[in-house]
Amino acid sequence: MGLKCGIIGLPNVGKSTLFNILTNSNVDALNYPFCTIKPNTSVVTVPDDRLFYLAKLAKSKKIIQSIVTFVDIAGLIKGASKGEGLGNQFLHNISEVDAILHVVRCFNDKNIINLSFDPIEDINIINNEIIQFDINLINKLKNNILNKNFYKWKYLLKICLNYLKKGKLLNFLSLNLKEKKFLQNLKLLTIKPMMIIANLSINKIKNKFFLEKINILIKKYLVCKICLKIPQKEKKLIFFKKNINLKKIIILSFKLLNLHTFYTVGIKETKSWSILKGTTALNAAKKIHSDIQKGFIRVKVIHFKDYIIYKNETQIKLAGKIRIEGKKYVILDGDIIHFLFKV
């Protein structure tokens, strides 16, 4: 699944630095606005101890991990939705991602070209721009409301418009799955799940004011605290290895995308597959190959904890822990799945 996390924020808050350390890249991360113009993209494998343990038990020759794509999007500024800076271009870049990592500077530095010292205020600047983008988009869609595809959603667009005008993000609006899917297909920005990346100073004393602000944010957002500012005497690689839990950030990004993992296990290969929570066995089959979905018969299901206890399929079968399920079975996180199908 080619799911993407977009890294956004004001200029010079650490977006490109975060992108570089997540993806082991070397894009420019300089102290002036719009250092990044075109979005940088890179793929990262998702850390998964379960996958490697299953592969070890099965003596697999090959291990294939799930992936998440990270996109480094240029800095937004106040007025971006009206075209300030290169705003419209950057906002459209956000529309192409599935989830948002919003980097916020949580330290003072007179050398940085961005004088705001309040992370909540900075978040609100970005939120206001993506809210206005969505208001503009919905107003344009109202002109197409006679289109059959939109007419039945007229009530929802009206609710969304009123919600946005109150300064609220649509990802906080209570929606059913069909409503959410419709809004996602419109590529609205505020419907996308968002995580705040709080870029703190290594100096804990200096962080006191900002930590108080972060504690306010935690009540509303998923928040990950990191330090992207390297002390002058430290070497970059050593500093990041000591101070940044990359595994945590990647796993939280995976969680933000609302994904589950299932596994196919064998001697030839053991592979993890990323699916949206709530995916049925029939739809998961298509992820492997469309022919498996077309010829779907049933699935054999083993849960991860049973594989760990009994070590191999023979013992699992003797223990009665292999379940047979049909096409409507909702796959759970950690399921080991064997698809039975006809060609």
Where are these regions (language model features)?
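Conserved G1/Walker A P-loop phosphate-binding module
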Residues: M1-E84, N88-D109, N127-E129
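C-terminal-of-GTPase-core extension/linker across diverse P-loop GTPases
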Residues: M1-V13, F19, N139, N143-V343
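Generic structural "secondary-structure junction" signal
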Residues: A29-P39, V46-D48, Y53-K56, K78-G79, ...
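Conserved Switch II/interswitch segment of TRAFAC-class P-loop GTPases
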Residues: V44-T45, A74-S81, S95-N136, N143-K148, ...
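Short, glycine/charged-enriched secondary-structure capping and boundary segments
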Residues: G83-L86, N114-D118, F209-K213, L237-I238
